[in-house]
Amino acid sequence: MNRPLRIGIVVGELSGDTLGEGFIKAIRARYPDAEFVGIGGPKMNALGCQSLFDMEELAVMGLVEVLGRLPRLLKVKAELVKYFTANPPDVFVGIDAPDFNLRLELSLKQAGIKTVHYVSPSVWAWRQNRIHGIAAATHLVLAFLPFEKAFYDKFNVPCEFIGHTLADSIPLASDKLAARQLLGLDEQRRWLAVLPGSRGSEMKMLAEPFIATCQKLQARYPDLGFVVALVNAKRRAQFEQAWQQVAPELNFVLVDDTARNVITAADAVMLASGTVALECMLLKRPMVVGYRVNAFTAFLAKRLLKTPYVSLPNILAGEELVKELLQDHCTVDNLYHEVSRLLESDNQALMDKFTEMHQWIRKDADQQAAQAVLHLIQK
């Protein structure tokens, strides 16, 4: 190849920007003059990715919001198709943002451009018929988790398991003492990390039962401290309101930060379901997962979900390593019972299992992604 390698790339949110940054660096390690064009976030643009539109154009959540922005989203998609068909890249990589990227990938694949979708949508869990749309739109899917590849293999859709970037960024052993010093927590006390969710809807459902559980735990374990991770000022305000209503006499240490340091500092964790459960597993902390959604969403989920578990540690292990208390089971009594059980066990067998699972998914995902994409280009 006499000209520089040209890769089309589109991300739709900050998590995708971080993946894109790692991917660009891994490609550039082999092809220093490689060019990237499409839609990047701040980290990708700092590496010289040429953004034809602002990433914020794609960062919309929720049905109503998406409908309001639909004409603009369709225009952005049409402009990208026009650009890439006039200037064909060696490959196009859509990172996450499946509602936008899979439609774009389909158009580009039909125009004869090789397409990769990086981060599998949760097709293995619900709406499994989406697999056919993914097969039509892509030449290759890059998946974080081994059971995702197994699902694609079943349908003969090309997929590479590249490992999980979180497993790469989190060390195999985490330093509880250093995290406590960083957060200014008493090093001698026992601490429970309380993570009632990063979304407003989660906080609304979980803050009160989580706080009431802490109230009950405090009566039994007077030495137990409670540290809460809050992703932004809105979640902090929501939590503080629930705190004043339920148990104003309790002491909580509120941390405006990502969950990682809070989990690392803790002896046990009570959390909302989500990626944070995987992070907790990788940090080797015993946890209880609590989750509530509104009745209609729960009704739909019951019918659509194809997995027996909702938390990633359990899905990955294929067994209930972590207690999941969902909907009507997410009560103060049940949460209290399960957290007490963790506080009174040494949990060593569970920690050993978490370490083994960490090693399963720690493969240097950036390098694996770059290798898989370069292999596809050379085919």
Swiss-Prot record:
<keyword id="KW-0328">Glycosyltransferase</keyword>
<dbReference type="GO" id="GO:0008915">
    <property type="term" value="F:lipid-A-disaccharide synthase activity"/>
</dbReference>
<dbReference type="GO" id="GO:0009245">
    <property type="term" value="P:lipid A biosynthetic process"/>
</dbReference>
<dbReference type="InterPro" id="IPR003835">
    <property type="entry name" value="Glyco_trans_19"/>
</dbReference>
<protein>
    <recommendedName>
        <fullName>Lipid-A-disaccharide synthase</fullName>
        <ecNumber>2.4.1.182</ecNumber>
    </recommendedName>
</protein>
<comment type="similarity">
    <text>Belongs to the LpxB family.</text>
</comment>
<keyword id="KW-0441">Lipid A biosynthesis</keyword>
<dbReference type="GO" id="GO:0016020">
    <property type="term" value="C:membrane"/>
</dbReference>
<dbReference type="Pfam" id="PF02684">
    <property type="entry name" value="LpxB"/>
</dbReference>
<comment type="function">
    <text>Condensation of UDP-2,3-diacylglucosamine and 2,3-diacylglucosamine-1-phosphate to form lipid A disaccharide, a precursor of lipid A, a phosphorylated glycolipid that anchors the lipopolysaccharide to the outer membrane of the cell.</text>
</comment>
<comment type="pathway">
    <text>Bacterial outer membrane biogenesis; LPS lipid A biosynthesis.</text>
</comment>
<dbReference type="GO" id="GO:0005543">
    <property type="term" value="F:phospholipid binding"/>
</dbReference>
<keyword id="KW-0808">Transferase</keyword>
<keyword id="KW-0444">Lipid biosynthesis</keyword>
<keyword id="KW-0443">Lipid metabolism</keyword>
